[in-house]
Regions:
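N-terminal targeting sequences that direct proteins away from the cytosol to non-cytosolic compartments
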Residues: 2-76, 82-83, 143, 163-187
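Conserved polar/disulfide-associated segments of primarily extracytoplasmic proteins
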Residues: 66-166
Length: 187
């Protein structure tokens, strides 16, 4: 082989190795950026009827809109809002009639589906040990366009959806407190 051919191959190998190193570094940085520190203190809200508990800041209050949701034609098992100084977190729980689970779908498949539906900033996150699809959508509200972030998960029984206009730096530490439980049986 000619000296220039060997140098060319060596340059390709070095470029490949450098590219792999950069990719590994970016992956490690992204994984570190995904670490979310849960809020400390706060008050725990018991949603065991829907299979979870959630801790919110001490100044938060809770409104139950389930009756209003049903009166407006909604089918939520629970519809409510936890709210405080930093904003509002709407919480919806639905029966999962399809019986599927988010974890049975590949990440790329889910992200592509939501992006094709018009969502932006779509990504998967793990909160409370369960996968969530997280996305942003812009909707036309009474006062013009509004941007909402949704954090959604489902298993074979229940679909849980958190919707908010709060900054992700404020809402993610709250959502990081979610603990999944068995669904409490009601008589």
């Amino acid at each position: 082989m000619k000296k220039s051919t060997v140098q060319y191959i060596l340059a390709l190998v070095i470029c490949f190795a450098v590219g792999c190193g950069i990719a590994l570094g970016l992956n490690a940085y992204d994984k570190n950026a995904e670490l979310i520190t849960p809020i400390s203190g706060g008050q725990t809200i018991d949603f065991s009827a829907y299979g979870f508990t959630l801790t919110v800041p001490d100044d938060f209050a809770m409104n139950d809109y389930t009756t209003n949701n049903a009166a407006e034609g909604g089918n939520a098992l629970f519809a409510g809002c936890a709210y405080g100084e930093i904003g509002e977190l709407y919480i919806f729980c639905y029966t999962n009639d399809s019986g599927d689970e988010l974890r049975q779908y590949g990440e790329q498949e889910v992200v592509t589906y939501y992006m094709n539906a018009g969502a932006t900033d779509v990504r998967m996150r793990t909160l409370g040990g369960r996968r969530f699809i997280c996305y942003r959508a812009t909707v036309n509200g009474q006062d013009g366009e509004e941007t909402w972030d949704t954090y959604e998960t489902w298993n074979e029984d229940i679909q849980i959806s958190f919707e908010t206009r709060m900054n992700p730096d404020d809402v993610l530490p709250i959502l990081a407190t979610i603990t999944f439980t068995s669904i409490a049986q009601t008589n």
